């Protein structure tokens, strides 16, 4: 170690470069490991997590399986009675309510749940009894934060709180900080408190009626989930026998049930009706892969500089061999030195992690702490990292060093055959990774920008939305008329669906014998309401039809009056019409109610992410709705928005629960995952470029120092600085050019797979690949030039005296 410390002092620059590279690589790797660990623990904190399942519905429509979060409301009782493996079953329904005491109400996320909910999903209580907290018909348990909001410092237990225009609840428990879960809420209330709206009072007309109820089950110890899953088809048939009158399908024939393991819901299961966006496995894979590549670049840097410096330790090796050192002893010595440096790098990495933590938290959108590194599988990982990194980075240089022959060393003829080729391969690999990450970053950013504007089927610019309007009191219709007369407002519409929202309502329609459709029943049509101004406000493109009967008023629609609807092209196709125009004038029947007549077909309108296929939508023309959309005039819209908000405040003084915003912002929210992936690639791609050039900087310095005398001779015989620069630049830019040939096909294939998830996507532009390669080349040239110009500009006399 004395020899090592002396060597490190003599080569401080390269030691610091190695230490910095290893510290950055290890810090990136451990930060990502922390994030992956945090994401992987969601829903694992329940007592019997491995026996908890969500029973979800599944609609089999046109050969496509549509997963639903919801299941038939009446499910829990029959399940526990007929499936012996199920130990307990419970339901909950997600809601967003105004909670408080008059006149102060606060918008909160709340679950309505069965009495045994806290015994199945055992969220811990700080105060109260989980067995009885929801057994009380008006019981509610709240988080500490909500209790402080509602009651200040007063004892919340036993106090009452009101759902505005709804139930009065009594606080029966205080929730402890819950384990990380796919459910997000501030309160859980007894479902019976809803009175006439409760499940018991809203008896399903059909077993297949699906409201918003979500069912969870806990299996008995030792029970097989496969046995339960295998029993579900027969269970469904007993309660919902196939209907021969619906041979083509129908809700009665297309519903099945499935089991979702609760610990898998957050990361692995996406279903219609998900309460909160889950985690994204793709993001974890991108992060993990990029972090490993960053660590690989750091290891390659160490290997490259260690082999390039090997000649400087050749004399030490020769002397050690002369005094009896064996090769395996030298390999162990030099590998141990690498492990020691990696250990120092790990210590430095922990300091870097602390500094970088706020930026990393913002990047991944989650609060993360260093404390988990000391427990679970992360502790052995953190301890093993310097050992693995040191061995991987130091073993090959140790072989090179220990392979020197004493005689050749003492004669000054020591060489390391093959080491230069290995260094070239590693440099190619480093820059290939950097170039690939740059191409991926640019393509992801182009794709996100593209899908936010292309193929929407409407014009999102200048659309302003006011959401969560109360319905049924007539204020929205009056407000609409007033807003339509504001300067700067071009059109106003009311609807029950806006971009980035989901109707969560799939309907089936019967078609009469004389229809122009090839089907007698259409399934899986997503239905929502919009008034007669909806399409003009959104700028939808009419494909066929479009005229409402003269004198017809949307306000007059009820169960006794005719109903009219507009279909999207996908809905018309789903209904069996070969041409959109064939659907116009057709009458569709559902649930025995008055028919709905199709008056028009519009181009597909995409309200969800471009990851989803075009939705088959039916727009029932009806007055009212909980969303108001305004098309504003172009230009400076701040004054108009202020005027709109003032008018809304006048009609709804308690507007703390209304949400305002532009449609562009809502669409941006659909692509948070993709945008985050792009930011991750940009951040780590930049890190990869810096690390690769850090290694190149060290290699260039070593090469320039080793060729100082050669450069001096070339200067004496007339070579200029530019000649020396060209000579050295070609040596180090050639691997970068080769790296392009390696990176391009690999990243093209990876991006092709990623882009295939989208129904609307950009082409992989050749210019993107060329730009990334050119940027890497320019950065490499600048890095090389720093050393070459310094050495080439020195006086030849000094260079010829260099040893």
Where are the regions that the model predicts?
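Alpha-helical transmembrane segments of integral membrane proteins
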Residues: 1-16, 272-276, 305-332, 336, ...
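Generic structural signal for small/hydrophobic residues in well-ordered secondary structure
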Residues: 8, 18, 39, 55, ...
